[in-house]
């Protein structure tokens, strides 16, 4: 009789631990794959430069300006390693887009709320040119 009670106790403890593990795994997965649930990153190389990229984010209804900014900063830190060489970037706000905006259709997600230009020190002049054209300050990383 005692073995059955202890077996039941062990079963419920393991079931509880499995539930907690699955919850933590889900939180970790959604944190690392934020763009899959909210926005989609759009990374376009800038013509005539070696490392400069134009980054933006578009998506469905949960992709508001806050989510776009979060995804752009996440992509900046993933794509540009300041340990290789210093990186420069600027983030330009599209003021014609509301903070909470919705896609035009399933295929047309509408304009991006933020656009970033980023590159390494080797393309310093190109980054400055694109950022100054939009009146944005160049930041160093």
From Swiss-Prot:
Major location category of this protein: endoplasmic reticulum
Keywords: Endoplasmic reticulum, Glycoprotein, Lipid biosynthesis, Lipid metabolism, Membrane, Signal-anchor, Transmembrane, Transmembrane helix
Coiled coil regions in record: none
Role noted for this protein: Component of the ceramide synthase complex required for synthesis of ceramides.
GO cellular component: acyl-CoA ceramide synthase complex; endoplasmic reticulum membrane
Species classification: Eukaryota, Fungi, Dikarya, Ascomycota, Saccharomycotina
GO molecular function, one term: sphingosine N-acyltransferase activity
All ranges on the Cytoplasmic side of the membrane: 1-3
Protein's gene: LIP1
Keyword Endoplasmic reticulum: yes
Keyword Lipid biosynthesis: yes
Name of the featured protein: Ceramide synthase subunit LIP1
């Amino acid at each position: 009789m005692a073995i059955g009670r202890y077996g039941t106790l062990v079963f419920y403890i393991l079931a509880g631990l499995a539930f907690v593990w699955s919850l933590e795994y889900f939180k970790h997965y959604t944190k690392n794959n934020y763009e899959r649930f909210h926005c989609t990153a759009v990374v376009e190389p800038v013509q005539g430069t070696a490392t400069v990229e134009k980054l933006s984010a578009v998506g469905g209804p949960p992709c508001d300006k806050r989510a776009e900014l979060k995804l752009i900063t996440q992509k900046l830190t993933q794509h540009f390693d300041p340990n290789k060489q210093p990186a420069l970037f600027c983030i330009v706000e599209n003021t014609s887009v509301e903070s909470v905006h919705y896609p035009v259709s399933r295929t047309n997600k509408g304009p991006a709320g933020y656009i970033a230009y980023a590159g390494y020190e080797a393309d310093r002049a190109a980054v400055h040119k694109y950022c100054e054209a939009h009146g944005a300050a160049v930041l160093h990383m």
